[in-house]
Amino acid sequence: MRALKILTFTFLIFHASGQEVSLLKLCTHCTCSEIPDIDGTHLVLNILCSELDKVDDLADLDKIQWPDNPNGLKISATFEGLGLTTLGKLPPNTQVETLRFSSNAITTYWPNPFSDLPNLKILSFSQNEIAALTPDLFTNAKNIEDLDLSYNKLTHISPLDFKNLQRVKKLNLQNNALGKFPVEALQSMKVLEDLDLGKNGIIDVLLKRAKSEGLKGVKRLNLSGNRIRSIVKDSFPDENNIELLDLSNNVIEVIEEEAFLTCTSLRELNLAQNNITFTFALPSTLQIAILRINTLYHWPQFPPGITYIDLSYNRLSALYDETNVYFDNLEVLNIGGNQIKEFELQNKLPRLFSLDISYNIIAEVPKCISSQNFPTLEELRLDGNPIESIYFKNIIALKNLYMNDMNRLTVVEDKAFSNVIGRAGDEIEFEKTCFSLFLSNCASLREIQGAFDGTNLCMLDVSKNNLTHLSRTLLEWRNLNEGANLQFNPWNCNCDMQWVIKDLLPQMYKTNSLLLSELRCGSPRAYEGLRLVHWYNWTEEAMCTDVYDSGNYQIAPSTIKSSQISSLTLILAGCIIAALLVATALSVYLVWNRRRHKVRQAALKRKRQSALDVREASGHEQFSALNKV
């Protein structure tokens, strides 16, 4: 019996070895190419297998055959959108450095699937169905530096799962179902720098008490889109190197006064879209502060090195106290969407290039807006304020000026923008400067007078207003190198607007024809809704005709002489007359035929009635005879 078992086992071995294993050549079914790497420093052999490739049996990744690589290039392979549910063990290759299995349905995997890929550094399982990890997934993948497990279904991570990943610098766990910060699981990642835990279900951050080597080197920490309600003194460890901290899109209501002071390297802090009401202390190293969409009533105390402040859509009612701040390094200030009535500054902001005070309740253009106070300003936003009259009192140099959504503005008066000049860039230092003006969606704006005397515009946007007339002398239209957006206005297409077709329309057609698609007439009635581009290249002055009176139009008498009537016109007229004659004859025939049909029907009806009367009379006589008998 024992000899029989040995013979059977030997037969199976020889039978299996005699069969040839069919390997799947990747470059036959997928796209293989030599491309520069992400840094552009050297070439890599890129293999892309996507849902567009008709690949059979690719679920058995252990049966793939790596392509020949005579130049010894590093290999980057992507298996994307193939519907993979199980990850098999990949065949050996020492040149594979990047593997991506994104947008599949992977739930399980073979033990040690990467044990024969000793130089694997970048691994992505983004957008799969992984609900749990086991230590044997990364047992022999000790060189991984970038691991992406985002958009899976992980609820818990054990310290043993990552115990072999000691060289990971970037870890992405975004959009899973983690209920708490996986501090213990990061213990082995001693060189971790970038950690993304956004869009999970984390409710608190208490890292100060955690003794984890994996958190000491973290420079970028993303906790956005969680359920964090408060930030306290114990939220971050004393010795941390966090430079970028994102806590946006949480439900934070309380931040303790000194909660961020342990972050001595913090440069960027994002607290947008929370419920923060009270201010707190900020570290002295902070340069970028994003606090938009909160409920702050007062300005935080920003450090001297601050360069970017976004306090838009809070509840601020006044500016900061100039005696207690130092904004010499400030480059961007966004306080739009607040309740500020007055914008008056005494101190200069020497480096500010973008100022947004839109959607407040400022009733006039601030008098402090000048090149003296803002010597480097490039972009100014005044949108949505209840400004009724525009006038810049002092000279200001800009590249872009935004004054949209001003519902109380009815007329832009003379010299409104005379003190606004263009700001030269480095590339056009010695050329004539210009600025772009966006004055759109002002529902009551019906007239623009000599507002641009002494100015030079690059682009003018007066779309979606209530303008009916446009003066030829309003500005130097030829200098608008970026075009003019005149769309969605009820233009009165009369002779005074003929110059638009003659001069402005050809210029816009060549430079930016997209700005002509909704450039239409609003009056007179005959032209209502007609696009002005309809008259492009017309030799006649279409808007200067006298045939339209009070919105009602008449057909103008023909000016064509009889000798100029072409044969085609005669043929067409003859066809129309013949068609009318045929139609008339057919109508007469149908009427006559219908009358004849009615007469025949009436005669037939009378005949049937007579026959019926005869039968009834005969029956009555027979009945009478029987009674007599």
Regions found by a protein language model. Give the residues of each.
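Extracellular leucine-rich repeat
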Residues: 2-629
